[in-house]
């Protein structure tokens, strides 16, 4: 078909396990040949929110359009990470993703 579904049934497993509301069910559709994501949906049940985006049509929280911040400086920005929980990876290896 040229497409594949990518599903994370509990995106934010650690938050879910600790009863923190920031977890969700993530689903994406990727065009295989170009590895281009064409749509994505994240359902956040604890907050009763649904985020979705379609390539070329924008991103939404429920039905409200959302966009990335227009912040121009790092000092005014908020950065978050999602390091894997494999204790065999050293910090140096993980930090190569952010250089």
Where are each of the predicted segments found?
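Pocket-edge structural micro-motifs
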Residues: 9, 63, 81-83
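Short, surface-exposed linear patches
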Residues: 27-30, 61-66, 74-76
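DPxDG-like acidic metal-binding loop motif
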Residues: 2-60
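Short helix-loop capping/hinge motifs at secondary-structure junctions, enriched
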Residues: 35, 58-61, 65-68, 86-88
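An extended, acidic
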Residues: 67-99
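Short, low-complexity, polar/charged sequence segments that are solvent-exposed and flexible
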Residues: 25-26, 59-61, 72, 97-99
């Amino acid at each position: 078909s040229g497409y594949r579904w990518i599903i994370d049934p509990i995106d934010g497993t650690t938050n879910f396990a600790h009863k923190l509301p920031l977890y969700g069910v993530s689903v994406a559709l990727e065009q295989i040949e170009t590895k281009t994501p064409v749509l994505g949906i994240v359902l956040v049940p604890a907050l009763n929110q649904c985020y979705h985006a379609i390539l070329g049509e924008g991103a939404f929280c429920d039905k409200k359009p959302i966009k990335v911040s227009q912040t121009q400086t790092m000092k005014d920005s908020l950065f978050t990470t999602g390091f894997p929980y494999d204790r065999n990876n050293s910090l140096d290896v993980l930090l190569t993703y952010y250089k």
